């Protein structure tokens, strides 16, 4: 077979170079609009499996099973492209390319590189037309009919003053041969025809009906002529051509030898005969395989060539992801996606495609989502972690671009510019409401000081924790005390001006208090005095130390404090002043003898914790700050008596004393405490134990106390922020272990979802887990398991399983012993084999709703605890997972407008879970059960 070639390499003669440019443009036009050759010198991926398909398509014979396999030959080879030469058959004008490849060794694959283009753009001309020949076009006695718009666009303009209008055209083919045609405009109706010279061209090229011809008018005002043969199977192979089996053996042997010796080998690529490109740029391969997630059920579109040399997108659905030939080519990405096409006319389309050929309609970025699925509890040490990964490695493994690499473990893609996307990021969505959290500042500052921490370090750490926008995990720098004092002095100057303005406003508001409110507060104070007498008896303080005059003065003092609290609730600078006051005490290194309680009481003096926007900030769980205390310290610190004070006009109860007998430090005795109370203007010093401190009301959208009619001996009467903290109760087996964060407005329990396990261990690694049998009701009280019996009965171990687009199923989870067995059974029930075990690659996620109405990722809890707490299971598609993230961001960006908390219905039904508006309900993005897919 004689060949004429034109390549990228410079030729010795100028004429040859000119021919190279022409043939290059025409070669791409004849190859097709979807063909793109990689540039010389770039890195490519070669698929021997795809090369075999080209041989099978050319010879119309599949690969025989007796052809030996090469186990050492990988299904994809990373190679360096040294040369590309474009060829065309002299007799048939069939275009093909010759490529010289050299496999890269492991060390060369690890070397960083600058990625070249995704391929040389197909040099499709802009001024051309392509027509499929009809029977009349190929007849020897007729001419070639040219569409009117095509003739006016491509051919030189005719002189319509002549009768008939006609001209002579000269066109060049791929081999630089000239062909002359007579272009005439005639007939009834009149049309453009090529007459003289056309029959000679058809006979010389042996064109038949179904073949296509292209006419191109290039930038040099030259007319080019190309041919596209119709794909017709060859019934008789020439004797000079090797047999199909020999060609298969040859290409496999050449590739295996080159891979073993890192030597060069040559391949031929026929774009018109090959079903798909089997040599693609490495950048294109990496982008499709490692940076695009696909899953079963996902919609996609794919480009196809039309008859007129244009492209069209066809829509389809992914129906499966598996190896095309798992026996001979295991772990190969070649045609690993099974698809179903929408149009009935797409029967000739391939039932399997490769990842780099399709365009998923829903793409998943590889960096962590801004609203990730969080672990509800810290994972117990010693137990297998999420999906079999170690907890320390989970953050990096989840973000690794090669996590699900099945064959190219040695690849290094640092030079591709995608590495910043892979870095684990700290999710700051849960920290938006913590920047002005005064209660957090008060508790952290006071408790750390009581533990004997250096005040300067405590202040620096606290200020950094409050003001750091990103909570850096790599290099947390300490703030110098001098810089801290300078910042605090500036803030105090600014706040002093604001306080003067607020004092004027407060005086006006205080004058507007109605007489009815004062009478109501007086009645509340009388009730409080009776409760305080019970408190003193409970604490063992003799009543002889409480003169009636002091009690009466205390009553007047509390009345004035409660009135002042109503006014201070409108003071936006109160919380900021409290933070600055505490920081100034901690930041001063010249006051080592300051009482451990002064910092806390100075903050406690502020009676309002409203933010500058007039709303209530979300707060982090208090047990995050107190988790390092022992059982005795926790129980004593939170051993508060029931105050039963009514709510003021702002919705907050009065202060309540918190007693902690364990906070006895050297040099900080009763005298220091007395001085602190005198600074606060307290006249009822003897009414409070010497080591008592006053905690402000717990900030949040939900009311913190509820009227109770029980006696003082009621074990549920010792409440802190609506939570029973009696250490003798069964609800508190270990001091602080069952202290839960109380929901804010909308019922949202604020937590800190971290993507880094190291950062997570610093703040919440020591938090004790709560029992799954306890939950928080709408009033915010922690209920015991015996009180939940009538509300959430657990009659059997059958659990409902939901999947969008499918009927719900019921499953007995008691017959399973691990998460792996459960995932396998769920995959079998819903036809998702191989998808649920690897959610990172497939995009499918399993979540469940526990009996506390929380949406959790399957695998968060140990298996026995999961069995006892699971309520229902939901299978989320990749689209639903993405909708959850969007819904979470909308909830964080929008302020809640009510205190309504949606709970599971009393009958224990989970069917309407996806339709509730609880912010914790991440299933708002889940399609309703039984609905159809919406693409």
From Swiss-Prot:
One of its GO terms (cellular component) is nucleus. GO terms for biological process: auxin-activated signaling pathway; flower development; response to auxin. It is found in: Nucleus. Interactions between auxin response factors (ARFs) and Aux/IAA proteins occur through their C-terminal dimerization domains III and IV. One of its GO terms (molecular function) is DNA-binding transcription factor activity. Residues 796-880 form the PB1 domain. Auxin response factors (ARFs) are transcriptional factors that bind specifically to the DNA sequence 5'-TGTCTC-3' found in the auxin-responsive promoter elements (AuxREs). Seems to act as transcriptional activator. Formation of heterodimers with Aux/IAA proteins may alter their ability to modulate early auxin response genes expression. Regulates both stamen and gynoecium maturation. Promotes jasmonic acid production. Partially redundant with ARF8. Its main location: nucleus. Expressed in the whole plant. The lineage of its organism: Eukaryota, Viridiplantae, Streptophyta, Embryophyta, Tracheophyta. Homodimers and heterodimers. The gene is ARF6. Residues 536-624, 645-714, 896-917 are annotated as: Disordered. This is Auxin response factor 6. CDD domains: B3_DNA. Residues 129-231 bind DNA. InterPro entries: ARF_dom, ARF_plant, AUX/IAA_dom, B3_DNA-bd, DNA-bd_pseudobarrel_sf, PB1-like. Residues 583-624, 661-689, 896-909 have a biased composition (Polar residues). Belongs to the ARF family. Residues 546-565, 573-582 have a biased composition (Low complexity). Pfam families: ARF_AD, AUX_IAA, B3. Keywords: Activator, Auxin signaling pathway, DNA-binding, Nucleus, Transcription, Transcription regulation. The keyword Cytoplasm does not apply. Induction: Repressed by miR167. It comes from the Eukaryota.
């Amino acid at each position: 077979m004689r060949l004429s070639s034109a390549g990228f390499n410079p030729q010795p003669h100028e004429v040859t170079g000119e021919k190279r440019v022409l043939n290059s443009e025409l070669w791409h036009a004849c190859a097709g609009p979807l063909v793109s050759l990689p540039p010389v010198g770039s890195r490519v991926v070669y698929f021997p499996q795809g090369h075999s398909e080209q041989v099978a398509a050319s010879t119309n014979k599949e690969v025989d099973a007796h052809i030996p396999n090469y186990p050492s030959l990988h299904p994809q080879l990373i190679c360096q492209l040294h040369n590309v030469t474009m060829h065309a058959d002299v007799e048939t004008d069939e275009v093909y390319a010759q490529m010289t490849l050299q496999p890269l060794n492991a060390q060369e694959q690890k070397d960083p590189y600058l990625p070249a283009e995704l391929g040389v753009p197909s040099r499709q001309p802009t001024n051309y037309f392509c027509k499929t020949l009809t029977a009349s076009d190929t007849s020897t006695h007729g001419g070639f009919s040219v569409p009117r718009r095509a003739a006016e666009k491509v051919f030189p303009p005719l002189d319509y003053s002549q009768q008939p209008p006609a001209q002579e055209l000269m066109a060049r083919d791929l081999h630089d041969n000239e062909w002359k045609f007579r272009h005439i405009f005639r007939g009834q109706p009149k049309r453009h025809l090529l007459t003289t010279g056309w029959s000679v061209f058809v006979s010389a090229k042996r064109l038949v009906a179904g073949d296509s011809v292209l006419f191109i008018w290039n930038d040099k005002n030259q007319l080019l002529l190309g041919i596209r043969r119709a794909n017709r199977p060859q019934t008789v192979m020439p004797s000079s051509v090797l047999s199909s089996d020999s060609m298969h053996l040859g290409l496999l042997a050449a590739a295996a030898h080159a891979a073993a010796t890192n030597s060069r080998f040559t391949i031929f690529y026929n774009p018109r005969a090959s079903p798909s490109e089997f040599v693609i740029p490495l950048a294109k391969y990496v982008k499709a395989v490692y940076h695009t997630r696909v899953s079963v059920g996902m919609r996609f579109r794919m480009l196809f060539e039309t008859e007129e040399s244009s492209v069209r997108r066809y829509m389809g659905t992914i129906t499966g992801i598996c190896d095309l030939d798992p026996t001979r080519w295991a772990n190969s990405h070649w045609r690993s996606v099974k698809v179903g096409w929408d149009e009935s006319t797409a029967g000739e389309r391939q039932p399997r495609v490769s990842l780099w050929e399709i365009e998923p309609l829903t793409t998943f970025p590889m960096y962590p989502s801004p609203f990730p699925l969080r672990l509800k509890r810290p994972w117990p040490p010693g137990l297998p972690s999420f999906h079999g990964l170690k907890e320390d490695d989970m953050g990096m493994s989840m973000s690794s671009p090669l996590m699900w690499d099945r064959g190219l473990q040695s690849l290094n893609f640092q030079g591709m510019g995608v590495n910043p996307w892979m870095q684990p990021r700290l999710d700051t969505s849960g920290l938006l409401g913590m920047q002005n959290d005064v209660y957090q500042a008060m508790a952290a500052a006071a408790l750390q000081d009581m533990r004997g921490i250096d005040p300067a370090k405590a202040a620096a750490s606290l200020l950094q924790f409050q003001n750091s926008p990103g909570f850096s995990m790599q290099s947390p720098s300490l703030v110098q005390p001098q810089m801290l004092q300078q910042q605090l002095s500036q803030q105090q100057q600014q706040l002093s001006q604001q306080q003067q303005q607020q004092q004027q406003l407060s005086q006006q508001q205080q004058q507007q208090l109605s007489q009815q409110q004062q009478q109501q507060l007086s009645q509340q104070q009388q009730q409080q005095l009776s409760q305080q007498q019970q408190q003193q008896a409970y604490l063992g303080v003799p009543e002889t130390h409480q003169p009636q005059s002091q009690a009466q003065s205390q009553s007047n003092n509390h009345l004035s404090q409660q009135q002042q609290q109503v006014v201070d609730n409108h003071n936006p600078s109160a919380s900021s002043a409290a933070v600055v006051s505490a920081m100034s005490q901690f930041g001063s290194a010249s006051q080592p003898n300051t009482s451990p309680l002064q910092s806390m009481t100075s903050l406690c003096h502020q009676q309002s914790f409203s933010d500058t926007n007039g709303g209530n900030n979300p707060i982090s769980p208090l047990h995050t700050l107190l988790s390092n205390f022992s059982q005795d310290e926790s129980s004593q610190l939170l051993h508060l008596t029931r105050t039963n004070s009514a709510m003021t006009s702002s919705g907050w109860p009065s202060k309540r004393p918190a007693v902690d007998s364990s906070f006895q430090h050297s040099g900080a005795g009763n005298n220091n405490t007395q001085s602190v109370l005198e600074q606060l203007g307290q006249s009822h010093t003897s009414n409070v134990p010497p080591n008592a401190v006053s905690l402000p009301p717990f900030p949040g959208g939900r009311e913190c106390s509820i009227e109770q009619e029980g006696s003082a001996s009621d074990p549920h009467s010792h409440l802190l922020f609506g939570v029973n903290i009696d250490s003798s109760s069964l609800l508190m087996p270990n001091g602080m272990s069952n202290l839960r964060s109380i929901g804010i407005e909308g019922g949202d329990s604020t937590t800190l979802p971290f993507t880094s396990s190291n950062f997570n261990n610093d703040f919440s690694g020591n938090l004790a887990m709560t029992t799954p049998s306890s939950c928080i009701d709408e009033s915010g009280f922690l209920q015991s398991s015996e009180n939940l019996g009538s509300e959430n009965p657990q009659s059997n171990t059958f659990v409902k399983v939901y999947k969008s687009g499918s009927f719900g199923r019921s499953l007995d989870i008691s017959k399973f012993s691990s998460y792996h067995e459960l995932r396998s059974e769920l995959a079998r029930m819903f036809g998702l084999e191989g998808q649920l075990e690897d959610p990172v690659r497939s995009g499918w996620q399993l979540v469940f709703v526990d009996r506390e109405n929380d949406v959790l990722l399957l695998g968060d809890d140990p298996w026995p605890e999961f069995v006892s707490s699971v309520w229902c299971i939901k299978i989320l598609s990749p689209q639903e997972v993405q909708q959850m993230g969007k819904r979470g961001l909308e909830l964080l960006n929008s302020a809640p407008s009510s205190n309504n908390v949606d709970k599971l219905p009393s009958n224990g039904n989970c069917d309407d879970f996806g339709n509730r508006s609880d912010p914790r309900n991440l299933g708002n993005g889940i399609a309703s059960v039984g609905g159809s897919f919406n693409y």
